[in-house]
Amino acid sequence: MQADRCVFFDRDGIVNTSPGAGVDRYVTRWDDFHLLPEFVEALRVVRAHGYQAVIVTNQRGVALGHVSAEDVEAMHKNLRDLLLKSYSLDLLDVQYCPHDVGECDCRKPAPGMLKAMAAKHGLDLAASFMVGDAETDIEAGQRAGCRTIRVNGDESVSKADWRLAAMKDLPDLLERVL
């Protein structure tokens, strides 16, 4: 059986608007989760090309007590329901790391979440992509063996395979590289 190809997406800043700084940098309620239309279009391209889509996200706010694991999981369920009901788009899975820095091998930049999803779902990491807005996302993708796309970052210092100045450019890039 052939392994599936996948596009892994970071969450905050790629799927939804990035929260602020400090304690406010954690999305703690569904009411504060604002889906980016550019992500919806990117997901449409991914699925049209036969790729699976998985969200992999560090959620340190769980370890720090700013948000409960149950609330994070409820937000992810709401996201999946919204994508399916409103856009007829699906995600294969959503994986999050609830740990603080240095407590695990799943928190990006470690590749643990990507490798776990590949093992769980039979994904071909070498034929897959990681999309993120931080260099930790890019490092996780590279360490897992994926090609990488950096969005909204300092293009001059990123080690990503592709670098984009804005989310609005992601659907077109995916159309060209998938």
Region locations from a protein language model:
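Ser/Thr-centric signal marking residues that sit
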Residues: I14, T57, T148
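Active-site neighborhood of HAD-like aspartate-dependent phosphohydrolases
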Residues: M1-V54
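Short, solvent-exposed loop/turn segments at secondary-structure junctions
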Residues: I14, R60-G61, T136, E155
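A short alpha-helix capping/helix-coil boundary motif
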Residues: P19-V23, N58-Q59, L92-D93, K115-A118, ...
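Asp-based, Mg2+/Mn2+-dependent phosphohydrolase catalytic module
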Residues: Q2-A3, V7, E70-D90, V101-M130, ...
